[in-house]
């Protein structure tokens, strides 16, 4: 079975054959699950500030642990 890809922006897993793969000039490969993630990445938006991304959810858990 093929390995699932992980979106470079939101952190969501998605099936191979879907989404987009972008290769930067330095050789780094970025996977995007949707055009929404792709556009937000190229616009320079920080995924830690958007509630629906995995990066935001992980940052929120870390903040909650620090408060205790």
UniProtKB/Swiss-Prot annotation:
Its cofactor is Zn(2+). Disulfide bonds: none annotated. Coiled coil: none annotated. GO terms for biological process: translation. One of its GO terms (cellular component) is ribonucleoprotein complex. InterPro entries: L24e/L24_sf (IPR038630), Ribosomal_eL24 (IPR056366), Ribosomal_eL24-rel_arc (IPR055345), Ribosomal_eL24-rel_N (IPR000988), Ribosomal_eL24_CS (IPR023442), TRASH_dom (IPR011017). Keywords: Metal-binding, Ribonucleoprotein, Ribosomal protein, RNA-binding, rRNA-binding, Zinc, Zinc-finger. SUPFAM superfamilies: Glucocorticoid receptor-like (DNA-binding domain). The keyword NAD does not apply. Signal peptide: none annotated. Binds 1 zinc ion per subunit. A zinc finger (C4-type) spans 7-37. The keyword Cell membrane does not apply. It comes from the Archaea. GO terms for molecular function: rRNA binding; structural constituent of ribosome; zinc ion binding. Zn(2+) binds at residues 7, 10, 33, 37. PROSITE patterns: RIBOSOMAL_L24E. CDD domains: Ribosomal_L24e_L24. Belongs to the eukaryotic ribosomal protein eL24 family. Binds to the 23S rRNA. NCBIfam families: PRK14891.1-1. Part of the 50S ribosomal subunit. Forms a cluster with proteins L3 and L14. This is Large ribosomal subunit protein eL24.
């Amino acid at each position: 079975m093929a390995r699932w890809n992980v979106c470079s922006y939101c952190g969501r897993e998605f099936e191979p054959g879907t989404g987009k793969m972008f290769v930067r000039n330095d050789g780094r490969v970025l996977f995007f699950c949707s055009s929404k993630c792709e556009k937000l990445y190229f616009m320079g938006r920080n995924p830690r500030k958007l509630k629906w991304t995995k990066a935001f959810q992980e940052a929120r858990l870390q903040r909650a642990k620090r408060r205790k």
